């Protein structure tokens, strides 16, 4: 082990690699399933593919760059900044994809009869494009000046050095904590989180309202209806919980860094917070895909067709979708 890498760093790198090895294949499988099953081509699954693409990029690009930044090689300031910005872009795209799916789930419960008329493929494509545009705007903002270059240049000049500063490439050396807290967290993370809380609270209210109506009207098999709606409710609660669990710790630590510079932050807490954010990408295929019957059947077919000698039977594209009853 190189002397510059601590035991905490080595453990962090190992966990990050493990997350990437789970995240990339899992999310590629989601995209693959949509490609091979025509029944998964509606607007709903476009948003799931958006999340899967973002999460593949997190595992394939963000995690390797995060490991590089954690090791801290000697680079020019702007080189380090270019390494840090893709991390911001792709993690932001995951957050916006989560929000898009939350809104989509709300519409499915709120207007089940008009859902397909409102959420058209064209509107879904516009929403997806908007997510990526916003992600690039948020993630590239440090490249346009909101960074730590001035402070680094002053320290560089004080040492009598000339030219562009050469630094040990670390995230906090190039990315301004004011940007991370005031702009990234207070504008682009916390509001989506609060909005999702409100959305899911409304969804729970609508489900409960529908349950009360349906229970009295469906005396034939109320347990079946209860089970279906309970599964939806549990999925929504899990989505919200995992989002908050994954993203809040790191941003809370950033707030501590900005508002209490003298406060000590144990390194292990920072590492745990970072891989929690990346780990959310590995969990998303389970939360968003494995709970949908059409995905489960398609995953099994992909496995049998490509990794076993015996091909799977054709996919029944008429499988009922796991949506609230119209």
From Swiss-Prot:
Subcellular location: Cell membrane
Family annotation (CDD domains): 7tmA_Adenosine_R_A1 (cd15071)
Glycan-linked positions: 148, 159
Keyword terms of this UniProt record: Cell membrane, Disulfide bond, G-protein coupled receptor, Glycoprotein, Lipoprotein, Membrane, Palmitate, Receptor, Transducer, Transmembrane, Transmembrane helix
UniProt cross-references to PROSITE patterns, sorted A to Z: G_PROTEIN_RECEP_F1_1 (PS00237), G_PROTEIN_RECEP_F1_2 (PS50262)
Spans through the membrane: 11-33, 47-69, 81-102, 124-146, 177-201, 236-259, 268-292
Residues with a covalently attached lipid (S-palmitoyl cysteine): 309
Pfam families per UniProt: 7tm_1
Disulfide bond entries: 80-169
KW Membrane (keyword) present: yes
Bilayer topology: Multi-pass membrane protein
SMART domains, per database record: 7TM_GPCR_Srsx
Residue spans, topological domain Cytoplasmic: 34-46, 103-123, 202-235, 293-326
GO cellular component, one term: plasma membrane
Presence of the UniProt keyword S-adenosyl-L-methionine in the record: no
Domain of life: Eukaryota
Function: Receptor for adenosine. The activity of this receptor is mediated by G proteins which inhibit adenylyl cyclase.
Similarity comment: Belongs to the G-protein coupled receptor 1 family.
Protein name, UniProt field: Adenosine receptor A1
């Amino acid at each position: 082990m190189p002397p510059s890498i601590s035991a905490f760093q080595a453990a962090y790198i190992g966990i990050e690699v493990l997350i990437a090895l789970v995240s990339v294949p899992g999310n590629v499988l989601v995209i693959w399933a949509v490609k091979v099953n025509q029944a998964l081509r509606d607007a709903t699954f476009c948003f799931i593919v958006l999340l899967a693409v973002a999460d593949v990029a997190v595992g394939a690009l963000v995690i390797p760059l995060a490991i590089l930044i954690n090791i801290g090689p000697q680079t020019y300031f702007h080189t380090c900044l270019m390494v840090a910005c893709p991390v911001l872009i792709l993690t932001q795209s995951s957050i916006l994809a989560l929000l898009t799916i939350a809104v989509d789930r709300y519409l499915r419960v709120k207007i089940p009869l008009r859902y397909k008329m409102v959420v058209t493929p064209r509107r879904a494509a516009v929403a997806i494009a908007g997510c990526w545009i916003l992600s690039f705007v948020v993630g590239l903002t440090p490249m346009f000046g909101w960074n730590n270059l001035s402070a680094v240049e002053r320290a560089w000049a004080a040492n009598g050095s000339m030219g562009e500063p050469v630094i040990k490439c670390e995230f906090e050396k190039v990315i301004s904590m004011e940007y991370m807290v005031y702009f990234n967290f207070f504008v682009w993370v916390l509001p989506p989180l609060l909005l999702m809380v409100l959305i899911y609270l409304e969804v729970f209210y609508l489900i409960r309202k529908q349950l009360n109506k349906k229970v009295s009207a469906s005396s034939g098999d109320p347990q079946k209806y209860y089970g279906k709606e309970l599964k939806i409710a549990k999925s929504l609660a899990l989505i919200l919980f995992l989002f908050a669990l994954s993203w809040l710790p790191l941003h809370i630590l950033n707030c501590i860094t900005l508002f209490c510079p003298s406060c000590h932050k144990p390194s292990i807490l920072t590492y745990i917070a970072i891989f929690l954010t990346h780990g959310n990408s590995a969990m998303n295929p389970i939360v968003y895909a494995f709970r949908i019957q059409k995905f489960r059947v398609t995953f099994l077919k992909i496995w049998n067709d490509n990794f076993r000698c015996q091909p799977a039977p054709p996919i029944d594209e008429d499988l009922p979708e796991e949506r609230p009853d119209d």
